[in-house]
Amino acid sequence: MGEKTTKLADKLYLLRAERRLQSKDVASVIGVEPPMYSRIEKGERNIKPEQLQKLAEFYQIDIEELHALWLADKVCEVATGMPAEVTKKAISIVNKELE
């Protein structure tokens, strides 16, 4: 199975790499084995909301940043294969709904 990087996965890798941590160090923070955390960083496995919260606390960053990346990945996942104009229109509708 090929790597399916996501914006959240890329951010999680960057946070760990910037701090020169090993994946086993971060895996223990969220209560998973290192191979599982590695798959999360590659975008091959989903991460649970409570695990995102633990990572935000561990890295001392705003949870909203991680939630926004998670949601952006979900939108991209659903929009894959759709014409760009349809996706833009759908996002516009959501923006209006959220105002």
Regions found by a protein language model. Name each.
Residues K11, Q22, K48-Q51:
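Residues that mark the N-terminal boundary/hinge immediately upstream of a DNA-recognition element
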Residues R20-R39, K54:
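Short alpha-helical DNA-recognition segment
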Residues K42:
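Short, conserved catalytic or interaction motifs in soluble domains
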Residues K48-E65:
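DNA major-groove recognition helix of helix-turn-helix/homeodomain DNA-binding modules
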Residues H67-E99:
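Short, charged recognition helix plus adjacent turn
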